[in-house]
């Protein structure tokens, strides 16, 4: 792979150091936009890989055998990484459709950021999905789950409660859980309020890219939830978040939390 890549760049007249500079510049530009930091990080990562590639080429001039071994190891690791990312991405994509048609008597709405007292775009998308589900299933009780973080004047739970009641959902159908600071806490604390007897039938509302990881966490807690997706409005953000979620899934599987 490395040799072919080197030959291709020479054939096309590409200067690898110019490529590195371009990816770094692209990363800096993308990083200026809120919500796209992970995509910016990918650009810097590609630049780093190209730089490492060039170092291996330079090493080959003085230590050809060592360079060959390192090139082979690099190619293998890169190939396995791409394969693992592709498989994980496919699993995330498959889980993103959820099961909106299935009825659940209890619903958990996972929190997201609040700007002061106003729901962020991601949180608003989740709330709109929850609202649609509650409208279609008038007997369903929901828990809005999320504590108060930095830059938030009220808890995520309070923000969600205000949003749903303003849209006409009966306040008696909404339970506020305002202590959770992570998805695992969202699920655990919400189930404590709902009752664990609903573990096999509870619905969970979250962004479509987050459903796969949320389901992994739920199953670890002994739940078998109905996953309900909230569609990310902008395609560019959706791609960014799906890519970020691949890394988040592996982080969770390796380190937990």
Which residues are covered by each model-predicted region?
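Membrane-interface helix-boundary motifs at transmembrane edges
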Residues: 59-71
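Short, Lys/Arg-enriched N-terminal segments with co-localized hydrophobic residues
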Residues: 1-8
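A transmembrane-helix-recognition feature enriched in membrane-embedded lipid enzymes
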Residues: 238-257
